[in-house]
């Protein structure tokens, strides 16, 4: 098998990871509901900005409390043509009230060549 050098051309595959912080566990029900609504709005803004959601995954069926085995419980997979969409997404959460309750990280990769090649 020949392993070709990967391209770094759009669309970019982006994995957004979200986890609750200590603030989430100390928040009231109303604060959690507001944070959840705001997270949804922030993620929809990314789609309005050009991110194409491929899949979402919430790892809460067999886990309660702060995530320990993996540091995140919410995963959203996007394709984006412009990485500025991702920068705006991260900055939007960073500058919102949601940052008191949730943390977000984005990773840029590509489709797995042995499956999508």
Q: Which sequence ranges carry the predicted segments?
A:
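Short amphipathic alpha-helices within nucleic acid-binding modules
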Residues: 83-91
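Short S/T/G/P-rich N-terminal loop/turn motif that feeds into the first structured element of a domain
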Residues: 1-72, 80-83, 110-117
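Short, glycine/charged-enriched secondary-structure capping and boundary segments
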Residues: 31, 91-92
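A generic structural motif
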Residues: 102-111
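Conserved, mostly hydrophobic/aromatic
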Residues: 76
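A common structural junction motif
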Residues: 93-103
